[in-house]
């Protein structure tokens, strides 16, 4: 097991409880920041990488749905210094040590530097002179579980409250919903693992706010089950990508066009798992997994729960040890204490 992390199943075992505690802390912190006027003005730009970038998808969707311009950007995909603008820049990093995210924040006007991190103190928290929203240094697995779900919660609550918005009451019930869904769906979802036994790849496809769920799911399948996987939006998938279907499994998140995509793929002889709130009849190749209808960020947390359950079972079927990572890159994380920080 990688130093500084707990086992995947250990993190999952206490996830519902830890998520509930984090939501309570985050709601209080965001409410206080809003009362101080710190969450007003132009919409936030969230920069992150990997799972942290995926976590910002549904919250950005929620902000745009309220008419607030907001973006999520890959921290390593832009020349530095980051262009000056009126929008606050939030570095999103569960460890607080992502090198690319730190580099972006370092290049931004100090008054516009903010962070959403799990670990405080950390280098990213230190340079975020505008403000830090901390998750509470929650113990997490190397292939992130509670760190990811709590990050989505933090960003979702922040999005709700931005510029005079109201934090959705459903957040106070989400941990209980999470636990109930986990109990109900675990046997059903684990039973789908044999679909991946001989799969050469996996496609994860999501409707607009669920693109982050598709991306995070593909990352988990690469990390935990070592299956080449890709996450993308439904609309992108329709523009040519689904033409290479064959030999893999298709996991689709959504309630509208996604139903037709799932039926089309299954009708053409491909294995499909459809994560949806709509009632869908199962077929020989179409396997619906029903989840509650929730606001975008809350729904994203339930969607990734389905993936967490599924990928662990798939790793078992394929004989992959969850805790064993193949590559450890030395330049993607900075030291916990770096010179000058």
Where are these regions (language model features)?
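Cofactor-/ligand-binding subdomain signature composed of acidic, glycine-rich
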Residues: 1-34, 38-41, 140-143, 149-172
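Peripheral docking tails and interdomain loops at the edges
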Residues: 290-341
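Glycine-rich phosphate-binding loops that contact phosphosugars or nucleotide phosphates
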Residues: 42-176, 207, 245-294, 328, ...
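Internal, active-site/partner-interface "lid" segment
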Residues: 7, 158-194, 319-341
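Anionic-ligand anchoring segments at beta-strand to alpha-helix junctions in alpha/beta enzyme folds, i.e.
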Residues: 21, 28, 39-88, 198-246, ...
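A general structural motif
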Residues: 180-188, 228-238, 253-254
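Alpha-helical scaffold segments in soluble metabolic enzymes
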Residues: 7, 11-14, 18-21, 58, ...
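Cofactor-pocket helix-loop regions in the catalytic cores of large enzyme subunits
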Residues: 20, 24-34, 48-49, 173-206
């Amino acid at each position: 097991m990688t130093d500084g992390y707990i086992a995947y199943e250990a993190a999952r075992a206490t996830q519902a409880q830890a998520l509930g505690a984090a939501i309570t802390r985050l709601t209080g912190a965001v409410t206080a920041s809003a009362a101080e006027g710190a969450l007003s003005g132009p919409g936030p730009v969230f920069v992150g990488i990997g799972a942290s970038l995926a976590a910002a998808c549904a919250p950005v969707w929620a902000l745009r749905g309220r008419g607030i311009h907001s973006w999520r950007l890959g921290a390593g995909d832009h020349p530095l210094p980051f262009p000056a603008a009126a929008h606050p820049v939030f570095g999103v990093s569960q460890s607080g040590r992502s090198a690319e995210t730190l580099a972006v924040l370092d290049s931004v006007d100090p008054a516009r530097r903010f962070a959403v991190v799990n670990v405080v103190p950390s280098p990213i928290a230190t340079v975020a002179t505008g403000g830090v929203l901390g998750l509470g240094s929650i113990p997490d697995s190397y292939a992130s579980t509670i760190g990811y779900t709590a990050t989505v919660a933090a960003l979702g609550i922040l999005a709700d409250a931005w510029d005079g918005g109201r934090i959705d009451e459903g957040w106070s019930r989400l941990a209980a919903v999470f636990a109930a869904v986990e109990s109900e769906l675990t046997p059903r979802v684990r039973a789908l693992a044999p679909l991946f036994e001989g799969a050469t790849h996996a496609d994860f496809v999501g409707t607009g706010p669920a693109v982050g769920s598709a991306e995070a799911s593909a990352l988990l399948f690469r990390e935990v089950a070592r299956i080449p996987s890709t996450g993308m939006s439904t609309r992108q998938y329709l523009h040519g990508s689904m033409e290479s279907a064959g030999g893999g499994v298709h996991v689709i998140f959504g309630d509208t066009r996604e139903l037709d995509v799932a039926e089309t793929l299954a009708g053409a002889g491909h294995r499909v798992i459809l994560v949806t709130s709509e009632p869908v009849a199962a077929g020989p190749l179409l396997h619906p997994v029903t989840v509650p209808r929730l606001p975008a960020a809350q729904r994203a947390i339930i969607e990734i729960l389905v993936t967490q359950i599924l990928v662990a079972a798939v790793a078992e079927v394929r004989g992959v040890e969850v805790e064993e990572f193949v590559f450890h890159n030395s330049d993607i994380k900075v030291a916990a204490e770096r010179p000058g920080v």
